[in-house]
Curated annotation (Swiss-Prot):
Disulfides per UniProt: C37-C68, C46-C65, C54-C86
Function noted in UniProt: Inhibits the glucose-induced insulin secretion from perfused pancreas; also plays a role in the immune system. Does not inhibit trypsin.
Gene encoding the protein: SPINK4
Keywords in alphabetical order: Disulfide bond, Secreted, Signal
Name of the featured protein: Serine protease inhibitor Kazal-type 4
Site (Reactive bond homolog): R48, I49
Entries under PROSITE patterns matching the protein: KAZAL_1, KAZAL_2
Molecular-function GO term, any one: serine-type endopeptidase inhibitor activity
GO CC entries: extracellular region
Length: 86
């Protein structure tokens, strides 16, 4: 009887191990970085140079500076997912 319980316990443990979700690839993982917004308290003006960044909110911002403005205005923790458009 003890052997049978041991086999059942091992089978259940194996099912739990096999059933774990494993990321398919590192590409699917999203890494973000904090924008540099310290200068925004001194002068909140952004240049008109188009240097887009993709925010964690899924919005493409014209520049990192514009993303900083959105962070301040909306009081949200928007970070940069990647340089370029979303």
């Amino acid at each position: 009887m003890a052997v049978r319980l041991w086999v059942v316990a091992l089978a259940l443990a194996a099912l739990f191990i096999v059933d774990r979700e494993v990321p398919v690839s590192a590409e699917k993982q999203v890494f973000s970085r904090m924008p540099i917004c310290e200068h925004m308290t001194e002068s909140p003006d952004c240049s008109r140079i188009y240097d887009p960044v993709c925010g964690t909110d899924g919005v493409t911002y014209e520049s990192e500076c514009k993303l900083c403005l959105a962070r301040i205005e909306n009081k949200q923790d928007i970070q940069i997912v990647k340089d370029g458009e979303c």
